[in-house]
């Protein structure tokens, strides 16, 4: 038990107990899994380190060892997931002084990840290739994400009552726990709870599609024979999307790539970064700016060209 720990006990044992006491049942499963992963790394990097041996030097070495194979932001997350447990150990007298004080966070240089998205012509080709029948299927799912920029788990959680067809709006207030047995879950963050406008064509399509469906049931997740819900896999939808792209001879993208496509088309159309951030449910405009930096830079270059042409025409 945590209250029976001694300074000579292993830090790995303490950290496992700390997670069990303070995090089990208190945080989302996906966040708990990250703490479990941190625990695995601690067991790998300092398996025999005792609580009384946790000094600033030994902690800095732990961070350095982790940073060798991880980017700086990931190392920062690793540090934050350890720090709470360590400060509690200091408060309990299990560690003499705070070893995390003045820690230096290092990490590998992040690889430049260029996001994949379709241009307007390619997206038009993709949507024209969808077979939209009378029942909700993955082609309708692909259409909806392309038109709204929703996250995969948000779209899975949609129910008919989330649509307000008379006002052409869609309420996003929950996600679907597709990774762990199904069921509704909270959104990624508070900013993810939002109401977005949808175009009249999407209104017509989904008003017809959902008119006979149970109001509170997910549109795209079916019930199984036992009364529960069938498992849904990201790879299933990605596979269908991939086949559409290959048949059309356009770049193959994932479902998340559809979200990027939606955002990029809005930015190229001149929609403000703030509006795009709110529509995507980003916690801040900084997230949007970082994710779509290359598009923003391209738009800035276009602005410079426009300014130069305007100035040249003054004479």
Segments from the language model and where they lie:
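DNA breakage-rejoining catalytic core of tyrosine-based enzymes
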Residues: 52, 95-97, 109-128, 179-200, ...
């Amino acid at each position: 038990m945590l209250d029976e720990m001694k300074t000579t006990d292993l830090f790995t044992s303490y950290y496992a107990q700390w997670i069990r006491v303070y995090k089990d049942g208190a945080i989302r499963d996906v966040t708990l899994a990250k703490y479990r992963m941190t625990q695995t790394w601690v067991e790998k990097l300092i398996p025999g380190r005792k609580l009384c041996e946790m000094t600033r030097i030994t902690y800095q070495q732990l961070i350095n060892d982790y940073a060798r194979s991880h980017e700086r932001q990931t190392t920062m997350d690793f540090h934050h997931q350890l720090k709470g447990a360590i400060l509690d150990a200091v408060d309990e007298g299990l560690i003499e002084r705070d070893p995390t004080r003045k820690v230096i966070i290092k990490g590998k240089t992040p690889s430049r990840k260029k996001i994949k998205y379709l241009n307007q012509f390619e997206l038009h080709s993709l949507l024209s290739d969808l077979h939209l029948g009378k029942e909700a299927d993955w082609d309708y799912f692909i259409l909806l994400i392309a038109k709204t920029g929703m996250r995969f788990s948000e779209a899975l959680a949609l129910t008919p009552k989330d649509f307000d067809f008379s006002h052409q709006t869609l309420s996003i207030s929950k996600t679907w726990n597709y990774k762990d047995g199904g069921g509704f879950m909270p959104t990624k963050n508070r900013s993810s709870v939002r109401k977005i406008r949808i175009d009249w064509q999407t209104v017509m399509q989904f008003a017809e599609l959902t008119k006979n469906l149970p109001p509170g049931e997910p549109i795209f997740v079916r019930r199984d024979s036992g009364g529960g819900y069938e498992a849904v896999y990201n790879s299933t939808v990605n596979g269908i999307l991939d086949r559409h792209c290959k048949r059309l001879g356009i770049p193959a993208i994932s479902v998340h790539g559809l979200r990027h496509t939606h955002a990029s088309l809005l930015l190229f159309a001149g929609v403000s970064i703030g509006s795009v951030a709110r529509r995507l449910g980003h916690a801040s405009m900084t997230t949007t700016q970082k994710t779509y930096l290359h598009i923003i830079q391209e738009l800035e270059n276009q602005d410079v060209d426009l300014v130069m042409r305007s100035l040249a025409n003054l004479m």
